[in-house]
């Protein structure tokens, strides 16, 4: 049990700290202050003292009340302090006393003023109901004193003490009936009511006695001490009797305090019953009961709130939230997690479970994002709306079509004379300007023959220019396949045939170099038949014309065959529509900016047109034809150089004229986004398997390159050729590839990434060279693609790890062993093969099994240290950190040589 402090006990007894300390001093309990701690025995002693005072005060008050009822005036209290006020009892009038004889009654008894015949104490009623037999016995022989008390007459001292002992002090006061009270109708009703009241009083007395007998325990004071808090008197309070007040019989209802009742187990139930029986009265509950009631109310309130909250939560949790998202393109991990209602960590965890290492800002392509969202419980809708990037190619009505010049592509193997043949047709010298006599990019020209135009496209024949050759085949109507009569069919010849067949382009074969003595056109025809090109004279449909670019023999026949093939194909186009065509080549001119060579296929391109070329937009500011002259319009099948683009387009992009610049900008922006998504999708993903492979194989070495070329096609060709050189050990990493001169920005990029700058047909400025020297960046300039490939191969070979090879130096047989102090075991050996060198690598072989691999620590010949011992000589050999050598072992000396590898 917890200790009690003085101020807590004073608060419980409702007295001041000073009065309590004085009282405890009179009782022999000395304390220093109100914070002093009291023992349990001291607390019980103080409570019993105050309880005796309250009991005496209650008895004195009962004397005063009885005297007041008789009209004798207040009784002096003789200095006894008042007991604390009990709960205020509502006024109830006592019924008029009966004389006991029915004959003396006038046939009606007096009713109480309130008109209620029920007993005031419900608690007593319940006791009476539980003990009907006892109540019946008591009803038969009720004493006269009890009847007198019930009639409102005062009790003498002996009777008062007996009433208190029987527990009747708690009976609520009864008032005299009013003088003007009405009589009850029927004497039997009045007698019945009086009889019931007597029975209840006798039952109450017996129940009180039983309770007093059963509650005689030591902790009685502690059990009802808290109840007495409400009943404790305030210090210095005077009673009305002491103040000289007199209370008449017809005044306010009396307040008779209850004496301390015996605390029983059913005390709270009795109090609840009493409070329920008197709805107008204030319950005289103890502090503990009030606290318990408050706790119960709070607990009920919390339970109701939790119950309501649980219902609300249950109502909220019932519909399962399913996120429905619409995906139109790539999306970052963080944005995807936000849209499907998950955290970024959950999405990353799922991706790692699928073997994809992702970060919070990494973008996922459309397919991956849709798969992740579906697996994480979201409903995914892929918006398949037609993107703005696609421009429909309008179908022209037949009446609007006009005949147009054919577009002819000259294709073939390198050095078979394509450019020379085209030069002979144009009667201009173009080959001399090409580096090494090799065409580096597509050239577009127009030739007039018999008042008709023919547009020629010259494609490179080198293997690195496959993409450019494929674009030339896609943009052409007729393909001229040039085959040298002395060389025959070569690899690029076969590739050109495949490109033309894939594009569905008719092929005209030009067998060139027939002027040479070793020329054999028949052999060429025979070889071409193996690839499905059968000459007309052999029953096929392929036109083959022998020509000579040097002597110009057969050139007119070749052009006539081209026009004949064009007539058969009926090439037509509508010149009165917005222009549409293909980008042949693009380059960056220092004075004019981005310049694109475009071939108009439909419509007419005019100055001021807004066009979109791939992911680039612009407004046509100027157009230059193949002769270098400015033109205002370009009809179908006309190649022109266009100025006014925002950036360099890719070779092979489709261009189309649109209504205004705003639409062109929107389309270009959308295409740039699509291009970025495709690059993201095509990029190699870092998976766990890749990480394990890299960890097992070691770090992959990279050769970083920055490529700058004169035209876009050359840069693409270099990129494709160099990327093919990558191996599992050395990778070519192209950091940047652009068109134009080498700039300081390129030097800064190369310096930061330790890259080499390769310039193809471009030259750096003086300040760029100086910046490269200061930064330690190497710039290599080339004009022929062969040299670039060879030099890059050599550089990659230098990055390869050298190959290690083991070289056996010699073998020695152990014939004796010696234990040398501080040196361990030394083997006496005889060199049987080669030589044994000091500090060489060695292994000990015992019965064909290697038992040690290490290094020779010492080598001696007699007592002298030697560098090596040749075959046929004896020596002493000491091995490093190995002493378990035995006779008969073989010591094998060897070394490791590194051999440089090549690609």
Swiss-Prot record:
GO terms for cellular component: cytosol. One of its GO terms (molecular function) is GTP binding. Residues 403-572 form the tr-type G domain. Residues 548-550 are annotated as: G5. Residues 458-461 are annotated as: G3. Residues 246-255 have a biased composition (Basic residues). Keywords: Cytoplasm, GTP-binding, Initiation factor, Nucleotide-binding, Protein biosynthesis. GTP binds at residues 412-419, 458-462, 512-515. Its main location: cytoplasm. Residues 139-152, 178-195 have a biased composition (Low complexity). Transmembrane segments: none annotated. Residues 121-132, 204-231, 263-276, 285-296 have a biased composition (Basic and acidic residues). Residues 437-441 are annotated as: G2. Residues 512-515 are annotated as: G4. It is found in: Cytoplasm. Gene3D superfamilies: 1.10.10.2480, P-loop containing nucleotide triphosphate hydrolases (3.40.50.300), Translation factors (2.40.30.10), Translation initiation factor IF- 2, domain 3 (3.40.50.10050). It comes from the Bacteria. Belongs to the TRAFAC class translation factor GTPase superfamily. Classic translation factor GTPase family. IF-2 subfamily. One of the essential components for the initiation of protein synthesis. Protects formylmethionyl-tRNA from spontaneous hydrolysis and promotes its binding to the 30S ribosomal subunits. Also involved in the hydrolysis of GTP during the formation of the 70S ribosomal complex. This is Translation initiation factor IF-2. The lineage of its organism: Bacteria, Bacillati, Bacillota, Clostridia, Moorellales. The gene is infB.
């Amino acid at each position: 049990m917890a200790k009690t402090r003085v101020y807590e006990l004073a608060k419980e007894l409702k007295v001041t700290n000073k009065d309590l300390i004085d009282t405890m001093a009179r009782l022999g309990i000395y304390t220093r202050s109100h914070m002093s701690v009291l023992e349990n025995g001291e607390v019980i002693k103080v409570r019993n003292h105050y309880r005796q005072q309250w009991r005496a005060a209650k008895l004195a008050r009962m004397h005063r009340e009885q005297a007041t009822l008789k009209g004798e005036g207040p009784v002096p209290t003789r200095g006894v302090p008042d007991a604390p006020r009990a709960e205020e009892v509502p006024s109830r009038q006592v019924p008029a006393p009966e004389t006991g004889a029915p004959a003396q009654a006038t046939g009606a008894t007096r009713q109480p003023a309130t008109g209620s015949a029920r007993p005031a104490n419900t608690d007593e009623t319940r006791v009476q109901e539980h003990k009907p037999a006892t109540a019946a016995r008591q009803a038969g022989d009720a004493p006269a004193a009890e009847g007198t008390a019930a009639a409102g007459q005062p009790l003498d001292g002996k009777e008062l003490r007996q009433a208190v002992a029987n527990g009747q002090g708690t009976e609520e006061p009864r008032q005299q009936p009013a003088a003007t009270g009405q009589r009850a109708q029927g004497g039997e009703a009045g007698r019945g009511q009086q009889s019931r009241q007597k029975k209840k009083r006798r039952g109450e007395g017996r129940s009180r006695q039983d309770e007093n007998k059963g509650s005689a325990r030591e902790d009685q004071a502690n059990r009802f001490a808290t109840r007495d808090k409400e009943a404790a008197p305030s210090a210095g309070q005077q009673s009305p009797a002491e103040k000289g007040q007199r209370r008449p019989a017809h005044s306010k209802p009396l307040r008779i305090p209850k004496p301390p009742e015996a605390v029983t187990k059913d005390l709270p139930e009795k109090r609840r019953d009493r409070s329920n029986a008197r709805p107008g009265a204030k319950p005289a509950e103890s502090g503990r009961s009030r606290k318990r009631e408050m706790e119960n109310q709070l607990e009920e309130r919390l339970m109701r709130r939790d119950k309501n909250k649980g219902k609300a939560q249950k109502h909220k949790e019932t519909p399962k939230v399913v996120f429905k998202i619409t995906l139109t393109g790539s999306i970052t991990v963080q944005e995807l997690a936000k849209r499907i209602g998950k955290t970024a960590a959950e999405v990353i965890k799922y991706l790692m479970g699928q073997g994809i290492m992702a970060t919070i800002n990494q973008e996922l392509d459309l397919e991956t994002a849709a798969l992740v969202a579906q697996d994480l419980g979201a409903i995914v809708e892929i918006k398949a709306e037609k993107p703005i990037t696609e421009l429909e190619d309008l179908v022209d009505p037949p009446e609007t079509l006009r005949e147009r010049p054919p577009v002819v592509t000259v294709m073939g193997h390198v050095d078979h004379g394509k450019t020379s043949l085209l030069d002979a047709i144009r009667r201009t010298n173009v080959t001399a300007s090409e580096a090494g006599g090799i065409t580096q990019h597509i050239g577009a020209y127009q030739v007039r023959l018999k008042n008709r135009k023919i547009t020629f496209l010259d494609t490179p024949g080198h293997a690195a220019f496959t993409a450019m050759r494929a674009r030339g085949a896609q943009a052409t109507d007729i393909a001229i396949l040039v085959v040298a009569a002395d060389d025959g069919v070569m690899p690029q010849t076969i590739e050109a045939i495949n490109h033309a067949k894939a594009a569905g382009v008719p092929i005209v074969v030009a067998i060139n170099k027939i002027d040479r003595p070793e020329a054999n056109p028949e052999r060429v025809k025979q070889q071409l038949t193996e690839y499905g090109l059968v000459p007309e004279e052999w029953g096929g449909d392929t036109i083959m014309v022998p020509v000579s670019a040097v002597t110009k023999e057969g050139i007119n026949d070749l052009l006539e065959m081209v026009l004949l093939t064009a007539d058969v194909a009926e090439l037509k186009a509508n010149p009165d529509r917005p222009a549409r065509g293909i980008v042949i080549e693009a380059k960056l001119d220092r004075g004019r900016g981005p310049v694109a060579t475009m071939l108009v296929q439909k419509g007419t391109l005019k100055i001021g047109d807004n066009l979109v070329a791939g992911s680039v937009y612009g407004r046509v500011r100027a157009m230059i034809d193949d002769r270098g002259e400015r033109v205002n319009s370009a009809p179908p099948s006309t190649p022109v150089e266009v100025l006014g683009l925002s950036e360099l387009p890719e070779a092979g992009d489709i261009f189309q004229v649109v209504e205004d610049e705003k639409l062109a900008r929107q389309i270009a922006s959308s295409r740039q986004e699509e291009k970025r998504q495709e690059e993201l999708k095509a990029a190699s993903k870092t998976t766990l398997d890749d990480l394990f492979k890299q960890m097992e194989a070691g770090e992959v070495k990279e050769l970083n390159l920055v490529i700058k070329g004169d035209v876009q096609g050359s840069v693409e060709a270099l990129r494709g050729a160099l990327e093919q050189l990558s191996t599992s050990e050395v990778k070519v990493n192209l950091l940047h590839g652009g068109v134009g001169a080498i700039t300081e920005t390129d030097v800064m990029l190369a310096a930061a990434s330790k890259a080499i700058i390769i310039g193809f047909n471009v030259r750096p400025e003086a300040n760029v060279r100086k910046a490269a020297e200061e930064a330690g960046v190497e710039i290599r300039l080339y004009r022929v693609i062969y040299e670039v490939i060879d030099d890059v191969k050599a550089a990659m070979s230098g990055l390869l790890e050298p190959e290690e090879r083991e070289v056996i130096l010699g073998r020695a047989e152990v014939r004796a062993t010696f234990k040398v102090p501080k040196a361990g075991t030394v083997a006496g050996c005889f060199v049987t093969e080669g030589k044994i060198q000091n500090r060489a690598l060695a292994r000990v072989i015992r019965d064909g099994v290697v038992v040690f691999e290490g290094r020779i620590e010492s080598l001696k010949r007699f007592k002298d240290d030697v560098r090596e011992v040749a075959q046929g000589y004896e020596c002493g050999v000491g091995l490093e950190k190995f002493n378990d050598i035995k006779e008969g072992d073989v010591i094998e000396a060897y070394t490791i040589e590194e051999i440089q590898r090549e690609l």
